[in-house]
């Protein structure tokens, strides 16, 4: 369902948009306080314009364009749950080859996480092909629901996450693609050749990213959220959610508001018996905003479809509210 992730990465753009205000001049003789200008909030149209520029750069395989507009904390999740950081993403884009006849980006919707962090969701409709994992042209799945998380970095906006789900009818999902044939094993090199070979396998591996200290705490909150969803417990969900919430589910449905999410999660759409949340990896976007990537499973039915054993990869954005972490944004994607 999510093969689009390999060859359509609608990330972010480096265009300057809004600046953090510096201290305002204090000209009042009797005013001893120094005032500061509040950071300028973006608009959905402004962030949509940045994503459009990124789309145009992506289909050209213009990887250099993305080097300055992806945050150093940028991550996407592959269909197998692998975290791809900024370096891996830029490298992947460099190999992209597309033949796009048209693209249409519509339905932009923005949700505030905090004054320096925003979620943007939109619908993308494509007509064309891009090279698949085997290098052969594949029709771009369409339409998809895309989501990007933007953070303010000095005087520009950068992306820290991007994801997309094929928009499908839960009651009539597309048929699963046939399984790929098993790969043939290549003859192994002899020990001497392998030891002397100057290959990537013999070069120093890049430093491995490590989750931050809040990971375990955030996984516990995430699990509590899933358990409250399973139980249709509106009171518990309400206590775990931030003031502003948005969410993209596995069917490409966008829940634009807190009220939408509460209504959907407590409705009769899903009948789930058990849930799990594992493989958590948290990274701080700021002292009060955390991004958690995780693996979830649910045993039951949703939208009339059996989801037992289905692996769901996703990202959640949490904001600090006093001593508690509250859910502000999430995107769940079915494993490929």
Model feature map: region roles:
Residues 11-14:
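Short, linear, compositionally biased motifs with a strong N-terminal bias
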Residues 16-19:
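C-terminal motif of bacterial Sec signal peptides marking the signal peptidase cleavage site
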């Amino acid at each position: 369902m999510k093969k689009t992730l390999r060859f359509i990465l609608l990330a972010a753009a480096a265009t300057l948009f809004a600046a953090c205000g510096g201290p305002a001049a204090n000209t009042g003789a009797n005013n001893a306080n120094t005032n500061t200008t509040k950071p300028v909030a973006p608009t959905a149209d402004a962030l949509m314009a940045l994503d459009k520029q990124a789309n145009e750069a992506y289909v050209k395989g213009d990887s250099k364009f993305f080097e300055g507009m992806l945050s150093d904390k940028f991550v996407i999740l592959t269909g197998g749950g692998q975290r791809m950081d900024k370096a891996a993403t830029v490298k992947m884009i460099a190999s992209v080859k597309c033949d796009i006849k048209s693209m249409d980006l519509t339905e932009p919707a923005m949700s505030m996480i905090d004054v320096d962090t925003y979620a943007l969701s939109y619908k993308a409709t494509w007509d064309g092909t891009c090279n698949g994992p085997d290098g052969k042209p594949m029709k771009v799945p369409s339409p998809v629901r895309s989501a990007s998380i933007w953070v303010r970095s000095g005087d520009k906006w950068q992306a820290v996450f991007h994801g997309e789900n094929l928009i499908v009818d839960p009651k009539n999902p597309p048929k699963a693609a046939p399984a790929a044939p098993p790969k043939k094993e290549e003859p192994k090199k002899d020990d001497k050749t392998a030891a002397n070979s100057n290959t990537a396998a013999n070069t120093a591996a890049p430093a491995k990213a490590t989750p931050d200290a809040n990971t375990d705490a955030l996984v516990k909150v995430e699990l509590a959220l899933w358990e409250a969803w399973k139980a249709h417990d509106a009171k518990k969900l309400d206590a775990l959610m931030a003031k502003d919430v948005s969410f993209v589910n596995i069917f490409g449905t966008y829940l634009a508001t807190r009220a939408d999410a509460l209504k959907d999660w407590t409705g009769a759409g899903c009948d789930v018996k058990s849930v799990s949340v594992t493989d958590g990896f948290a990274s701080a976007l700021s002292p009060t905003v955390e991004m958690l990537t995780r693996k979830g499973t649910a045993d039951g039915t949703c939208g009339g479809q059996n989801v037992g054993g289905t692996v769901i990869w996703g990202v959640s954005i949490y904001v600090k509210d006093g001593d508690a972490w509250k859910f502000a944004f999430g995107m769940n994607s079915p494993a490929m």
